[in-house]
């Protein structure tokens, strides 16, 4: 059996390629040749060309047929067309920007994606909603026009080793710099789906393993547990020698240093349903997300991006600690100036009689008996 991977050198690529080789596929990867990551088996054939140039891709693949082709890079719709009639099972990788509200929360009414969003959720239908998302949605349509039995996998934000936009670096560097505080918006309660590299590769390989189920289907991919932003920060701090710091919660409008972590102009949730891939293909995380975050943090600490380098430029995080300290000081001064009102009859609003946790109503019985 022969397999082709277009790309194969990004964060999830080597895991997918190794999985194909382990399954007995004679595997070829088509990529630019600029990156040759560790972990690609020696037996893998490399075709070096420009995956964004259809004519060069056509020339590189002239006269070849593959049992499986996985397109993770390049001009996805054109590669689907080029491989029409020349592949047994075409798999493509896209992303969550296809969903209305993912990149532009205001495209939904009220703002924000439905939680969770299923594969049949509303997609971007007009460039005014989001230009990138519109192109992603149209690309999906073109893929299935060229490959009616394709499997399309929608990726979330990817994290793990060799991620060129490592969101976790905004946390890890502050720990390495021994920062005593980190600013989070609205208590860090935002939820945003992410996927660890090994978990996403596992999802792709499940679709390869079960073509009778996966052909003609679209699947959301991601970790099964979605951690809040605060949980992400606390998990990474624990993994890095229990770094002691204070999480300073501010309203989103003031928490400007947290923008690179939230990665959108709102704190709306971005969570999808994994029910389809779980029930149809049996997906389960191979690496629990909390362990995956710890691995990612330790990898970043050992492979530190250059200060002011490409990764930090992509993240748009200036790591301006003096400005952050001034913001914290000003915010706390403003909070201290707020006087709470005197409540009518001395009774402040409560949490409701149904709540019986810490700070709630006392137990009606002193004992269980």
Regions found by a protein language model. Give the residues of each.
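Conserved beta-loop-beta element that borders a ligand/cofactor-binding pocket
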Residues: 139-162
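N-terminal Rossmann NAD(P)H-binding glycine-rich loop of SDR-like oxidoreductase domains
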Residues: 3-23
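A short helix->loop->beta-strand "cap" motif at the edges of active sites that frequently abuts
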Residues: 85-90, 148
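Active-site "gating" loop of Rossmann-like NAD(P)-dependent oxidoreductase/epimerase domains
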Residues: 95-134, 138-146
